[in-house]
């Protein structure tokens, strides 16, 4: 998270077949919905510009987290209250911490809006 916003996100997966639990907290986000995505590259030298597009190794269309046809990096939105910490609590069965499609080493982007 760049700018005045900051936060920490944790990814946990018990086995390669298990869903990934995403938890964490963001501070300083403006009130409202913020897109929450894994991007292709782990490069943050130029902020989000160097992180590349959403992680999409299977060349799918952009979609909601519950859609079968979606980028692997499409994790939906998080809701910020604006005056308190923003909780992140997502369980996702498409992303993985194992194998060729692993999200390890990539960038998590919290967008300015949904």
Swiss-Prot record:
Protein family membership: Belongs to the Cu-Zn superoxide dismutase family.
Protein's organism: Drosophila persimilis
Pfam families, per the entry: Sod_Cu (PF00080)
Name of the protein in question: Superoxide dismutase [Cu-Zn]
Annotated region (Disordered), positions in chain: 48-68
UniProt function note: Destroys radicals which are normally produced within the cells and which are toxic to biological systems.
Sequence ranges of Basic and acidic residues compositional bias: 58-68
GO molecular function: copper ion binding; protein homodimerization activity; superoxide dismutase activity
InterPro entries given in the database record: SOD-like_Cu/Zn_dom_sf, SOD_Cu/Zn_/chaperone, SOD_Cu/Zn_BS, SOD_Cu_Zn_dom
Classification of source organism: Eukaryota, Metazoa, Ecdysozoa, Arthropoda, Hexapoda
Gene designation per UniProt: Sod1
Annotated Gene Ontology cellular component terms: peroxisome
Entry's cofactor comment: Binds 1 copper ion per subunit. Binds 1 zinc ion per subunit.
Disulfide pattern: none
Superkingdom of origin: Eukaryota
Assembly information from the UniProt record: Homodimer.
Required co-factors: Cu cation; Zn(2+)
UniProt key word Transmembrane: no
UniProt-listed SUPFAM superfamilies: Cu,Zn superoxide dismutase-like
GO biological process, one term: determination of adult lifespan
Subcellular location: Cytoplasm
């Amino acid at each position: 998270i760049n700018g005045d916003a900051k936060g920490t996100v944790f990814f946990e997966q018990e086995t390669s077949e298990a869903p990934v639990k995403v938890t964490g907290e963001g501070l300083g986000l403006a009130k409202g919905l913020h897109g929450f995505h894994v991007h292709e590259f782990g490069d943050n030298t130029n902020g989000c510009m160097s992180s590349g597009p959403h992680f999409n190794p299977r060349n799918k269309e952009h979609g909601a987290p519950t859609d079968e046809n979606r980028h692997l990096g499409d994790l939906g939105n998080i809701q910020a209250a604006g005056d308190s910490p923003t909780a992140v609590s997502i369980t996702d069965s498409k992303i993985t911490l194992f194998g060729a499609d692993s999200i390890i080493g990539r960038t998590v982007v919290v967008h300015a809006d949904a």
